């Protein structure tokens, strides 16, 4: 009976949305068109399942992110980013791993659902895929705590759950999906210099490589967030001194180290935008809390990518050059 009610609700929604286009083919439009199509999908599925659209969007964005960098997953080719392995979609004992028949999929305990009422449960149909994911989450509840439980049971990884929750927090706060803008981490008018130092050798505390770019500037020059994100970490590290970590919607962790101090009232969990002041350039680090002055003042800026299994450093220098150039061109 509950499946019948869901099916009827979907049919009614399609009748009320005569211009809706939930096709799974690649969009030929610009980014604004893609964002609009995704938002339409998320809002429609929210109406059917009562799962908040920003959680659906966050899961979709997270999976799109990891599919873009993982070699063991196919690259996303449609509006949605969620991916189900054939065995999970069709059922582990289903002899037809490309099955799109809802009845046989259900018979073999597959998760695939016919979301748009075309008689097929297709892994390449955006609405089918997103509704399947949303229905899974709905089985745990639609409030924050139960959705977190559902996410953990699906991904079995605390870090993944926290990233998805942070992305959902950003989407909910801003009410939109286009949160890709960036800015340079120090004021353009400041005296600053930097070169590509990612991968250079470092000796203090043992042999290691430099996982970032050093931007030299005067002591106390404001340090700003480079992205839309959530403050994930704030505190002391014997290498980085006073430092801040911010996570954006692309699973990228932005690391700001050797600060002279933090912006007033900056706290973990806070939402920031490009240009939000988070601290000042300093020379803290290389010792116990409060150690400072062992090197010239500079900002150590690092970027780390999470792929669903682990997190690794990548070169931020090209991004810094791009953001600096973009900001200068806007002046």
Question: What spans do the regions from the language model cover?
Answer:
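Short, acidic/hydrophobic/Gly-rich beta-strand patch recurrent on exposed beta strands
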Residues: 213-215, 243-249, 302
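Surface-exposed, glycine-biased beta-strand/turn segments
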Residues: 166-242, 274, 331
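Acidic, glycine-rich catalytic/binding loops that coordinate metals and/or anionic ligands
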Residues: 182, 294-331
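Zn2+-dependent peptidoglycan hydrolase active-site motif and core
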Residues: 226-268, 289-296
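Sec-dependent N-terminal signal peptides of Gram-positive bacterial secreted proteins and lipoproteins
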Residues: 2-25
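Active-site loop architecture of trypsin-fold serine endopeptidases
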Residues: 205, 281-298
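Catalytic glycan-binding domains that act on GlcNAc-containing polysaccharides
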Residues: 25-175
């Amino acid at each position: 009976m509950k499946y019948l009610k869901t099916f009827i609700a979907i049919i009614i929604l399609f009748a009320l949305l005569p211009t809706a286009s939930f096709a799974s083919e690649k969009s030929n439009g610009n980014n604004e068109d893609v964002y609009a199509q995704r938002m339409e999908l998320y809002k429609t599925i929210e109406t059917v399942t009562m799962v908040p659209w920003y959680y659906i969007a966050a899961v979709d964005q997270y999976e799109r992110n990891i599919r873009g960098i993982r070699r063991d997953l196919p690259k996303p080719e449609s509006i949605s980013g969620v991916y189900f392995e054939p065995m999970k979609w069709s059922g582990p004992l289903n002899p037809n791993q490309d099955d799109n028949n809802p009845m046989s999929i259900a018979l073999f305990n597959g998760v695939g659902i016919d979301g748009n009422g075309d008689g097929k449960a297709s892994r390449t149909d955006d609405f089918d895929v997103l509704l399947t994911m949303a229905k899974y989450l709905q089985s745990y509840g639609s409030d924050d705590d139960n959705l977190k439980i559902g996410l953990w049971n699906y991904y079995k990884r605390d870090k993944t759950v926290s990233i998805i929750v942070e992305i959902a927090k950003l989407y909910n706060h801003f009410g939109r999906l286009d949160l890709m803008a960036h800015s340079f981490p120090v004021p353009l008018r400041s005296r600053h210099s930097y070169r590509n130092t990612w991968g250079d050798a470092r000796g203090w505390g043992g042999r290691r490589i430099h996982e970032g770019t050093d931007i030299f500037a005067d002591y106390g020059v404001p340090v700003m967030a480079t992205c839309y994100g959530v403050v994930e970490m704030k505190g002391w590290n014997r290498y980085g001194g006073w430092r801040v970590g911010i996570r954006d919607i692309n699973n990228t962790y932005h690391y700001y180290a050797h600060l002279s101090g933090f912006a007033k009232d900056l706290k973990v969990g806070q939402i920031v935008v490009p240009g939000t002041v988070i601290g000042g350039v300093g020379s803290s680090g290389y010792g116990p809390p409060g150690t400072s002055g062992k090197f010239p003042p500079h900002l150590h800026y690092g970027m780390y990518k999470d792929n669903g299994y682990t997190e690794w450093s990548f070169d931020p220098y090209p991004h810094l050059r791009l953001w600096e150039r973009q900001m200068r061109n806007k002046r």
